[in-house]
Structures are given as structure tokens and as C-alpha cells.
């Protein structure tokens, strides 16, 4: 099997297993490079931008965990560490760097955005771990009855 064929197969497999995760990640990339947003009443909320970052990344990582837990019977902690925690944080950093350097000043990269993103990812991981424990507890409880 050639590398190109393997890559396409892997992508198709991931798309089938994690469609909502891929949709969330794609949406983050799109929203990160939209040159402007219309004004809303929420603009007056203090730190609304940071809350938005936290919710986007926390929600995305929660979705990654939920889709993972639906497809797997056991946790691969190493895989989850890399793909459901580290990769989104690295992606966030890359996006912030690209916003600062490649958007003709229509967007800016900010350290506090990166911090909000990383906090969201970490909260998403905590939610995922809690869901994993609930899944194991329910499985164990059903086995006892």
C-alpha cells in the first residue's frame, strides 16, 4: 500500500470515526481567519473574546473525547494525551502565530488567546476523563447487576 493511499485511507477512517471532531476543528480554523466579525451586544461582556476561545477549544476537546469513548472500549492514554490534549494546544499556537504574521493585520495573535485555548483544551480533557470514569463505572455497575 503506497503512502498516499494509506494517508487517504487513514483520513477516511478518521472522518468516519470522528466526524464532529473534524467539523469542530475545521470550524476553528475558518473562524480563526475570518477577517472581521459583526458587532454584537456581547462585545460589551468583559473578556468575551477569551471566553469564546475557552468554549471553542473546550467544546472541541470534549467532542473529541466523546467520539473516542463511543468508539473504544478501553482508553489509550498515550493516544488521548497526544490527540485530545497536546495536538489541539499545538494547533492553537500555530493558529495564533499565523494570525499574527499572515493576516495583513486583520487578525492578531495573542498570548492570552493561546492561554484561553489551552485552558479550554485542559477543561475538555477533564470533562473527557470524567466521562470515561462514568462509562467505566456504568459498565462495572451493569456487570454486577
Model regions and ranges:
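Bulky hydrophobic segments
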Residues: 2-112, 118-145
Amino acid at each position: 500500500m503506497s503512502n498516499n493511499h494509506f494517508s487517504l485511507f487513514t483520513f477516511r477512517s478518521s472522518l468516519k470515526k470522528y466526524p464532529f471532531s473534524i467539523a469542530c476543528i475545521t470550524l476553528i480554523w475558518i473562524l480563526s481567519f475570518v477577517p472581521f466579525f459583526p458587532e454584537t451586544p456581547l462585545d460589551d461582556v468583559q473578556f468575551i473574546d477569551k471566553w469564546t476561545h475557552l468554549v471553542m477549544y473546550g467544546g472541541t476537546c470534549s467532542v473529541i473525547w466523546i467520539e473516542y469513548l463511543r468508539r473504544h472500549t478501553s482508553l489509550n492514554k498515550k493516544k488521548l494525551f497526544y490527540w485530545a490534549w497536546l495536538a489541539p494546544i499545538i494547533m492553537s499556537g500555530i493558529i495564533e502565530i499565523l494570525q499574527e504574521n499572515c493576516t495583513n493585520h486583520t487578525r492578531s495573535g495573542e498570548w492570552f488567546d493561546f492561554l484561553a485555548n489551552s485552558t479550554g483544551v485542559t477543561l475538555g480533557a477533564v470533562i473527557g476523563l470524567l466521562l470515561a470514569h462514568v462509562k467505566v463505572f456504568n459498565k462495572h455497575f451493569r456487570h454486577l447487576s
